[in-house]
Amino acid sequence: MNGSPTPKRYSSKSSRLYDDYYNIPYQYSNPTPMNRDYNDVGSRINADKLVPEEYKRNTEFINKAVQQNKELNFKLREKQNEIFELKKIAETLRSKLEKYVDITKKLEDQNLNLQIKISDLEKKLSDANSTFKEMRFPKVKDPMVDDDPVSENYDQINVPKHRAPDATGNPRTTNKVSNTSDQDSRLKAIERTLSVLTNYVMRSEDGNNDRMSPLPSPLNTISPINNRLNFQEPKRYNPTVKVNPSDDDIMMYESAELKRVEEEIEELKRKILVRKKHDLRKLSLNNQLQELQSMMDGDDNIKLDNVSKHNHATHRHSSQSSRDYSPSSDACLECSNDLYEKNRVKPENNMSETFATPTPNNR
């Protein structure tokens, strides 16, 4: 027998495990469910068995075709973008090609014109040289050569009396050499001046063309006449003058030209804007002047009408006293002016009256 004061507290059935706690069926096993087509999760078991092989193959083929279609669409977009960029580049190159073709045509025409001018100038130069030689050295008949050299008349030779002892040369030959040297130097100087003149003429005719290269001229090695003709244009950086200019040079030149043109356009726009502002200001001032003139003309007309209608002879005011001729009185301006003129007294009389002694009336 239990001697505990509370025996039921520790011997109740509620705290005791029930008998079949460890005898739960299927606790440590995995039995097959009742519906054999589905598993524990609820998905079908061996669902592919119901689908035929043809359908499987068709789905695989369709999936592959869809994937290939996506890849081909992506490649097609890339190719289209490349074609678009290439078209842009081709358009720019075509425009540049047309521009360069026009430039080459112009340069060819200029070159042809220059060649024609050069040929004409060369002809003129040759004619001028021939005429100068004819004028400078007229044709003289060749003297007859005698077989006997002793027959020459040596009495006509002017031999200097005081000759140097070592001077063994012939004075006639020395005179000829000096004359020929002087003539050659003069001819060279004339040819140089003619070349300078031709270059100056060509430069003056083609000075408006910026693309033409300046012709070489020997202006620094000639007499002061050529220094007077030393008209050199300011040099500009023009890569088209080169034989084979690079694309960078051409682009730099074009950008500089565009910048210069844009600056000129901005300057012209600014001038036009200032001119417009001045015109608008002038118009507004003219309008104000006309309005003021019209207002002045209207006021003058109103005053003339009032003067013609007003009769001062019959006009009476509330204040007819002689002292009430101030502008603040009820009298009109004309009447107040009349009163002022009537009652005005000279300053001499006023002063005499003020300092005079009063006299009684009954004297």
Swiss-Prot record:
Q: List cellular component terms (GO).
A: cytoplasm; nucleus; spindle pole body
Per UniProt, which keywords does this protein have? Coiled coil, Cytoplasm, Cytoskeleton, Nucleus, Phosphoprotein
Q: Where is the composition biased (Low complexity)?
A: 319-329
Instruction: Provide the gene name from the record.
Output: SPC42
Instruction: Give the primary localization class.
Output: nucleus
What family does this belong to?
Belongs to the SPC42 family.
Modified residue annotations for Phosphoserine = S213, S217, S284, S329
Q: Which residues form a coiled coil?
A: 62-136, 248-297
Assembly behavior: Component of the SPC110 complex containing at least CMD1, SPC29, SPC42 and SCP110.
Q: Where is the composition biased (Polar residues)?
A: 170-182, 349-363
According to its UniProt record, where is this protein located? Nucleus; Cytoplasm, Cytoskeleton, Microtubule organizing center, Spindle pole body
The protein's role, per its UniProt record: Forms a polymeric layer at the periphery of the spindle pole body (SPB) central plaque which has an essential function during SPB duplication and may facilitate attachment of the SPB to the nuclear membrane.
Region ranges (Disordered): 160-184, 310-363
Q: Where on the tree of life does the source sit, at the highest rank?
A: Eukaryota
What is the protein name stated in its UniProt record?
Spindle pole body component SPC42
